Amino acid sequence: MTETASETGSWRELLSRYLGTSIVLAGGVALYATNEFLTISLLPSTIADIGGSRLYAWVTTLYLVGSVVAATTVNTMLLRVGARSSYLMGLAVFGLASLVCAAAPSMQILVAGRTLQGIAGGLLAGLGYALINSTLPKSLWTRGSALVSAMWGVATLIGPATGGLFAQLGLWRWAFGVMTLLTALMAMLVPVALGAGGVGPGGETPVGSTHKVPVWSLLLMGAAALAISVAALPNYLVQTAGLLAAAALLVAVFVVVDWRIHAAVLPPSVFGSGPLKWIYLTMSVQMIAAMVDTYVPLFGQRLGHLTPVAAGFLGAALAVGWTVGEVASASLNSARVIGHVVAAAPLVMASGLALGAVTQRADAPVGIIALWALALLIIGTGIGIAWPHLTVRAMDSVADPAESSAAAAAINVVQLISGAFGAGLAGVVVNTAKGGEVAAARGLYMAFTVLAAAGVIASYQATHRDRRLPR
């Protein structure tokens, strides 16, 4: 049996009948992602005002650590207090943390505020995925997933531009004030969009204190995130590689511990014979390979002689491709076509990365820079055409329907930790390259080309492993 167009909801239905719910689910992710990129643009002006340059890296490091730790608690929060209370608690902490950042008299206070923002933001971003299956009809899961994850692309454009504007006007504190205002407005919408009753995953009543917090999983993932983040701080390759290896080991231990304990982050179906583990692995490979974007602005300035603003918009080409790919792919109806698209997505990414590799050169003319932008668009499209369908497959491939929200919540954990690994790996590749900046740029793109191409093994398994799925 194949899916028909009538079984797939429309964008009009999602953004009219479920407008409030869509704003809440996508809004939490947008707040988290926009705040991340906005703060990076504000930091130079912030340091010029309150000092603390030695703590520069920790503003983003502890934000990431806090968000990864919080992401591991999403399903537990839903089961203990329900969807509405989880959102309101996350928004309250995020708003308070934004006020702390806005009023920070020193960098130490700002770092504390950013840590709180990361904790609240990680919860909000995870809730955006985890509640798709319980707040939207199944016919809208794909479009809901596309809308939620598209917020990363939107944030990549809006965050740096907004942060740069506030910084240029000397109003960096006001930027955090605006985040507080947006958080308050969203909090007002939550009771209306999510209803009066606290609802857990799948619509069940929260079970209160009977569901334990996954303490060991939380600690291991927090330690892994910290190791990855600190890996970016040393100026020596050996320390960086060692920290990345330690982080990989911690993630491996996390998987083993999560498999053996009752209070877990990953749904039990991950460890079964189904496709869920391959779905997560495909997403992980895509996120790691996407982190080639970390060095695009740098190489754009040094090899293409672009201005900082132009180089920033060049880097945003990947996000544009991601968003466009998601919107277009979410309209696909045939299960067979969707399976082929998802399976081929890593190869689409690899083709874009290969194009980027062969076009890197010094003193690049406009035509070559246009090819760089095209390569990034292709890379982003490779992610976008698969991501919403991978999200739906994750929710739909669990052995027990009650695991569906846990499967969706784990997507955010996979996304955050994989992105951090990708950024760290990109740094190792660039810093070990011999032969100057052109060789470093080519080496980065080539290394990630190989990684993305290898991802086709996981994507094929993700779409063909479970023969029960319609063809």
UniProtKB/Swiss-Prot annotation:
InterPro entries: MFS, MFS_dom, MFS_trans_sf. It comes from Mycobacterium tuberculosis (strain ATCC 25618 / H37Rv). Could be involved in fluoroquinolones efflux. One of its GO terms (biological process) is transmembrane transport. The chain crosses the membrane at residues 23-43, 55-75, 91-111, 116-136, 146-166, 174-194, 213-233, 237-257, 279-299, 308-328, 337-357, 366-386, 410-430, 438-458. It comes from the Bacteria. It is found in: Cell membrane. Pfam families: MFS_1 (PF07690). GO terms for molecular function: efflux transmembrane transporter activity; transmembrane transporter activity. The keyword Transmembrane helix applies. It is a multi-pass membrane protein. This is Probable multidrug-efflux transporter Rv1634. Belongs to the major facilitator superfamily. GO terms for cellular component: plasma membrane. The keyword Ribonucleoprotein does not apply. PANTHER family: MAJOR FACILITATOR SUPERFAMILY, MULTIDRUG-EFFLUX TRANSPORTER RV1634-RELATED. The lineage of its organism: Bacteria, Bacillati, Actinomycetota, Actinomycetes, Mycobacteriales.
